[in-house]
Design a protein with these regions (language model features):
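Metallo-beta-lactamase
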Residues: 89-136, 142-217, 221, 227
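Short, flexible loop segments at the rims of nucleotide/cofactor-binding pockets, characterized by
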Residues: 11-17, 40-43, 62-64, 134-137, ...
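Active-site flanking residues adjacent to catalytic metal/cofactor-binding acidic residues
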Residues: 36, 67, 87-88, 158-161, ...
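Hydrophobic/aromatic beta-strand patches that form the interior of the parallel beta-sheet core
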Residues: 5-7, 65, 86, 120, ...
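Conserved beta-strand hairpin/beta-sheet module of binuclear metal-dependent hydrolase folds
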Residues: 2-53, 146-164
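Zn-dependent metallo-beta-lactamase
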Residues: 1-31, 186, 192-194, 211-216, ...
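Active-site HxH/HxHxD metal-binding segment of metal-dependent hydrolases
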Residues: 39-116, 229-238
Length: 257
């Protein structure tokens, strides 16, 4: 059966100076090697190292998947120009003309998507290989897709930001909505109904056991260049309220063109 290997872990932390945006990059290995999300340029060398540690070069990847076109998940696809890139047609269209309030999809996003020479538009039910399939899970963005993988651990969902981090499985609320709030809630519920194990966009893999989060891997993160006791360094564990982009109510599938 296919297996999932975490190349880069996602992390949900922010700072008062901006968003690091470290997303998960997952390698699904079965009949093909499928890479889901590639991160931003700040993790370019880390992605290269993760592949090298597994004896892989960029051209060894058979398929890449763009869960959605936000900057933190998609800037390194140019490393894989010899590999087909799967993207939902709604996401591809939206990237050409993003909403002006959408800070996660800059105006250059469309050019970044179209830079790939082999774009494959995929919709609900597309099968990458037996046991690895695409479902359409909109809300966070119009064309967000999740990869469902049949593994020895059950059905695993590689979600991108349909489900940012583990706590979303409890709140059932997407913390960042750029497309449609109701769709986002429905997509979260669908993943929770269909998946045994979840690989979120910005957290470690987990499962729900009796309504509690059970992480499958320990936290492993090192901060360099700053001392925890340095004056002005603070840690804030206050939960962040969810954010819905102003203007989402004006967006429709027809408006994508």
């Amino acid at each position: 059966m296919p297996k999932i290997d975490v190349l880069l872990h996602g992390f949900p932390f922010r700072t008062d100076q901006g968003i690091p945006g470290f997303c998960s990059s997952l390698l699904i290995t079965g009949e093909k090697k499928t890479l889901v999300d590639v991160g931003h340029v700040g993790r370019r060398l880390a992605l290269q190292q993760a592949l090298q540690e597994r004896g892989l070069a960029y051209d060894d990847i058979d398929v890449t998947v763009m869960s959605h076109a936000h900057w933190d998940h998609s800037q390194n696809f140019d490393l894989f120009t010899k590999t087909p890139m799967l993207v939902h047609p709604w996401e591809r269209k939206y990237a050409q003309h993003p909403h002006p309030n959408d800070w996660a999809t800059p105006a250059w996003s469309g050019a970044m998507v179209e830079f790939q020479p082999d774009i494959v538009e995929v919709e609900e039910g597309y099968e990458i290989e037996p046991g690895v399939r695409i479902i359409h899970t909109p809300g966070h963005s119009p064309g967000s897709i999740t990869v469902l993988v049949d593994t020895d651990d059950g059905v695993c969902a590689v979600t991108g930001d349909v489900l940012h981090y583990a706590n979303v499985a409890l709140t059932k609320t997407n913390p960042l909505v750029f497309w449609n709030e109701r769709d986002a809630e429905k997509s979260i519920s669908r993943i929770l109904d269909e998946a045994d194990v979840i690989y979120p966009g910005h957290d470690r893999s987990f499962r729900l056991v009796n309504g509690e989060i059970e992480y499958l891997e320990p936290m492993n993160l090192t901060f360099a260049g700053v001392h925890p006791d340095a004056p002005g360094v603070k840690f804030d564990t206050t939960p962040r309220p969810p954010w819905v982009m102003p203007g989402v109510e004006d967006q429709t599938v027809e408006s994508l063109g």
